[in-house]
């Protein structure tokens, strides 16, 4: 099924709204009676959403000062966008934290962010209250318990009377992996996030108010936050929020609400839907945009999705530091294995691994560095790590890849994931891609572990069979041996029921490495 991307608004080139607060206000004013959010039986129009945000902002303004950090510890819900935009209205800085984290993992993040208030859900209230007491955080607001959404919608009150936010004000704190073990805080301003929204709207063209979004990725993750909250509200679309990720339920929602933009994200989500019993009979005629991001996407899985639904998967490449994409397909066209071309206003270069300064010609592999008007201001309170990552105006991504002669970007591997086997560099993704082409394989993950025999490393492959399929590990070993040079073949293949997935729905290579070393158990078939 092919779609025309020459749509109203697809060629919009006007400057983005200067702040996210004004972006939100424009949406509320332009489409007050249109449905903004939908979850289960609860529905909020843009007018009701605007009222709820104003009411919560008034309460927050009594608890925090402008510039204070307010931590959002919320699942994907009606409450998340209310809390986020209310914090902005109160001139606070929202810090987006994964609500699935245990207390021991949250405590250092809240401390690092210097949070002065936490907004949470009833499920985590007791834990958050205890943490707040231990850390000296003055305020905890529990949405859905202390404060109910209908109560906020019905509340009347005077305007806040605070100054308007500026493009240079901080608008979000996100968390990215740190070299010391503690995640770094990625800081973005209103202006840079608003520019990022504009970039996404151009990369994956929108139809405006006719768009119906179904996001899967967590709103606390940059991909889910941008494509599931900011972009839909910017174009005054409708956001259908699933209660949970259950493949049959998601397919049902896609059909019932005539979803046009499915923010699937990582490969694990699409693999899950392909296994859904009701996918084959689903009417997906309204669906036109299926973007992917957050993890390398196997070409074979894209082909299976296209065969099952008639729809293309449009990849994007980005990270928390780039809010969130630097390259994307759709307008640039789909090229197998590529994440597309750099977005307008952005730049993607491939540089040598030794110095990071020499720009390589098309076809040569090296480290990708990116820049654009939507890149982070830096890592909060981490000047040294900021200087290591941002050099000469570019963010050094740590990703290995190349650009072809037509300008399409290809990602080969994370720099840190390259495995050294028998004196050769091996890219696990290449091996994963091959294993995915086996007719009986649903998912595969490949990692490197120390090899006591050689003193180097060896490859271990974890493979999940498709529903109803069984095979012996030696079958995969033979399959690889007939198609790869010997040092790229896994020395061990393990058949498992499922692969470990992170909270952002990415394949968890850290857990796979632990399992390969015998430090963690995975369910076997």
Regions found by a protein language model. Name each.
Residues 12-17, 25, 33-64, 68-77, ...:
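Conserved AMP-binding/adenylate-forming core of the ANL superfamily
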Residues 17, 32, 156-175, 182, ...:
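Conserved pre-ATP/AMP-binding loop-to-beta segment of ANL
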Residues 40, 59-62, 89-152, 160-163, ...:
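Structural core segment of the AMP-binding/adenylate-forming
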Residues 45-47, 171-198:
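Conserved AMP-binding A3 loop
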Residues 58, 101, 118-120, 262, ...:
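AMP-binding/adenylate-forming catalytic core of the ANL superfamily
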Residues 194-212, 220-261, 276:
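Conserved AMP-binding/adenylation subdomain of ANL enzymes
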Residues 259-265, 274-335, 347:
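Gly/Ser/Thr-rich phosphate-binding loop
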Residues 341-345, 356-388, 424-426:
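Conserved ATP/PPi-binding loop(s) of AMP-dependent carboxylate-activating enzymes
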